[in-house]
């Protein structure tokens, strides 16, 4: 299990978590492509941070106030990143990935370098289109939302993270 065994215990990730100043981490990684042992990832995170590590299914109770959302780091599984816009792609699912990407103020995405695409069109042409057609929702997270639909006053950060941290990992040599 590459992510739990090598990325999570790293001193760099410990510094990122400490710098984020979060009191809780919402973990939304399902077992699958990059994670065969969710319990190992949770244990490794608990060893790096004094923050509470919660399953993202508890996001709505963990982020009921603005103060709670500010103190929360979301760690959903990003399936791709788009270099031209700084966007990460998060798929929906029972693991709570969308809540973990929309409710906390800080979002940490850990990606395989092979999942980094120059543009949205490149990603869509190499399999992203099928994900968009198969899932009920897919979040394209570029940063805090911006809206001016109430009295034409710009409001930033109503939905989505205010801080987006992306860690890109090189594939292991064959």
Would you name each region that the model predicts?
Residues 1-174:
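The feature marks the mature, well-folded catalytic cores of soluble enzymes
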């Amino acid at each position: 299990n590459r992510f739990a065994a090598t990325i999570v215990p790293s001193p760099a990730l410990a510094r990122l978590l400490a710098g984020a100043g979060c009191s809780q981490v919402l973990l939304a990684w399902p077992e699958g492509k990059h994670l065969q042992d969710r319990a190992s990832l949770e244990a490794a995170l608990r060893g790096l941070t004094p923050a509470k590590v919660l399953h993202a299914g508890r996001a709505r109770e963990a982020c009921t106030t603005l103060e709670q959302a500010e103190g929360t780091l979301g760690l959903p599984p990003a399936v791709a990143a788009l270099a031209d816009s700084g966007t990460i792609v998060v798929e929906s699912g029972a693991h709570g990935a969308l809540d973990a990407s929309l409710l906390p103020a800080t979002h940490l995405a850990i990606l395989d370098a092979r999942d980094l695409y120059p543009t949205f069109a490149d990603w869509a042409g190499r399999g992203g289109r099928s994900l968009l057609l198969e899932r009920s929702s897919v979040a394209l997270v570029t940063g805090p939302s911006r809206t001016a639909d109430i009295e034409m006053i710009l409001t930033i950060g109503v939905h989505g993270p205010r801080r987006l941290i992306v860690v890109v990992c090189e594939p292991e040599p064959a």
